[in-house]
Amino acid sequence: MAVFVVLLALVAGVLGNEFSILKSPGSVVFRNGNWPIPGERIPDVAALSMGFSVKEDLSWPGLAVGNLFHRPRATVMVMVKGVNKLALPPGSVISYPLENAVPFSLDSVANSIHSLFSEETPVVLQLAPSEERVYMVGKANSVFEDLSVTLRQLRNRLFQENSVLSSLPLNSLSRNNEVDLLFLSELQVLHDISSLLSRHKHLAKDHSPDLYSLELAGLDEIGKRYGEDSEQFRDASKILVDALQKFADDMYSLYGGNAVVELVTVKSFDTSLIRKTRTILEAKQAKNPASPYNLAYKYNFEYSVVFNMVLWIMIALALAVIITSYNIWNMDPGYDSIIYRMTNQKIRMD
């Protein structure tokens, strides 16, 4: 019995984290089910939902084949640390168990966007306020240049007139506590991103896809400070759920219903699953490679469209030739056909 309880605890610890779909367009189909998704394949799910290829096939039944000719214009990935799952409203959200919760990044997706849409300068924003880590490329440099990213900037932003402090029910949270301010500053970042994007709506209407990756650790710090059973943690969790729902609705609306908003909740990352060793049998790299970055070929945005057009036209022509040949081969012209008719000269001779 004790062994069974231990196994249940281990399973709950491994599969307690969640990967949720807050919003998705009709062209991206996520099936309802309890299929676990490995943590290291989260970037592949984001890439496939945007229409990009991945190195390894993803045999996960949660993501179905959607409309190949209508891909989402934006992917928004929000990762919340410090909690297994949030009390999201049932029915409006699709959630899957997350196994092997290892640290991941969307750098591969960002690189695909840069290589395919380098001339259109799409918006790529990766932000972790608690670590003061920010990565902005393309039009994000000009649009989000006023976004508060450092802790000092976030603190000053909170005490301005149009901050979220004036609209959020703080309840047990305090404005004078650094941990609480860190949590509230992350909510301010969510609000500012949607607010800045609403002033530049033309960015959400271009042909290049956009990527937003946000890492929120404020709830984790509140749990460490007050405890997960504290009133502060419960209030912060409820405030975060409301803020995430509003943020998802705003981003989904700004992109005209053509955006995927995803949420990853992780209690803690399992760093023991990360392999950092190298084998001594690893093949040696060339001393002077032609390209040290191993860059992929730059394909045109219309590559998949043209390929499908040529493919189906060739299939249609091949079927037309086969059907025509079959009909000619089995054609019975009959005795009234011109093939069997006799000329007038032949009739006179007879």
Swiss-Prot record:
Gene of this entry: ATP6AP2
The name this protein goes by in its record:
Renin receptor
* CC annotations in GO: autophagosome membrane; axon; clathrin-coated vesicle membrane; dendritic spine membrane; endoplasmic reticulum membrane; endosome membrane; external side of plasma membrane; extracellular exosome
Bilayer topology reads: Single-pass type I membrane protein
Q: What does this protein do?
A: Multifunctional protein which functions as a renin, prorenin cellular receptor and is involved in the assembly of the lysosomal proton-transporting V-type ATPase (V-ATPase) and the acidification of the endo-lysosomal system. May mediate renin-dependent cellular responses by activating ERK1 and ERK2. By increasing the catalytic efficiency of renin in AGT/angiotensinogen conversion to angiotensin I, may also play a role in the renin-angiotensin system (RAS).
Per the UniProt record, the associated disease is: Intellectual developmental disorder, X-linked, syndromic, Hedera type: A disorder characterized by significantly below average general intellectual functioning associated with impairments in adaptive behavior and manifested during the developmental period. MRXSH patients manifest mild to moderate intellectual disability associated with epilepsy, delays in motor milestones and speech acquisition in infancy.
Q: Any keyword Transmembrane?
A: yes
Tissue expression pattern = Expressed in brain, heart, placenta, liver, kidney and pancreas. Barely detectable in lung and skeletal muscles. In the kidney cortex it is restricted to the mesangium of glomeruli. In the coronary and kidney artery it is expressed in the subendothelium, associated to smooth muscles where it colocalizes with REN. Expressed in vascular structures and by syncytiotrophoblast cells in the mature fetal placenta.
